[in-house]
């Protein structure tokens, strides 16, 4: 454990941020899995709605600094490609 007051505070702050980021990433993975399940099932209308939900969450994660903007753009692009590849 750190001895300096400011480093002790940073340890606590970093832990709070880590837990918050973990929750955001977990929600992203959950919504992304739901989207991919709908694509596999062939339900295009529901998949489109779910993609909008997931894309919005990716944008929010970028705004919060959880993800890099290029990472989110890549994931949204792949989701769009999967959606467009549906019959």
Curated annotation (Swiss-Prot):
GO cellular component term of the entry, any: small ribosomal subunit
Keywords carried by this UniProt record: Ribonucleoprotein, Ribosomal protein, RNA-binding, rRNA-binding
Matches recorded under InterPro entries: Ribosomal_bS20 (IPR002583), Ribosomal_bS20_sf (IPR036510)
Biological-process GO terms, alphabetical: translation
A GO MF term: small ribosomal subunit rRNA binding
Lipid metabolism recorded as keyword: no
PANTHER family on file: 30S RIBOSOMAL PROTEIN S20, SMALL RIBOSOMAL SUBUNIT PROTEIN BS20C
Similarity comment text for this entry: Belongs to the bacterial ribosomal protein bS20 family.
Function statement: Binds directly to 16S ribosomal RNA.
Protein name: Small ribosomal subunit protein bS20
Gene source species: Corynebacterium urealyticum (strain ATCC 43042 / DSM 7109)
Gene that encodes the chain: rpsT
């Amino acid at each position: 454990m750190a001895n300096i007051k400011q480093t002790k505070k940073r340890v606590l702050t970093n832990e709070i941020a880590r837990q918050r980021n973990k929750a955001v990433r977990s929600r992203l993975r959950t919504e992304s899995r739901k989207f991919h399940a709908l694509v596999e099932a062939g339900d295009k209308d529901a998949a489109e709605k779910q993609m909008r939900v997931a894309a919005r969450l990716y944008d929010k994660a970028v705004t919060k600094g959880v993800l890099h903007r290029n990472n989110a753009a890549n994931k949204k692009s792949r989701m769009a490609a999967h959606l467009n590849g549906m019959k």
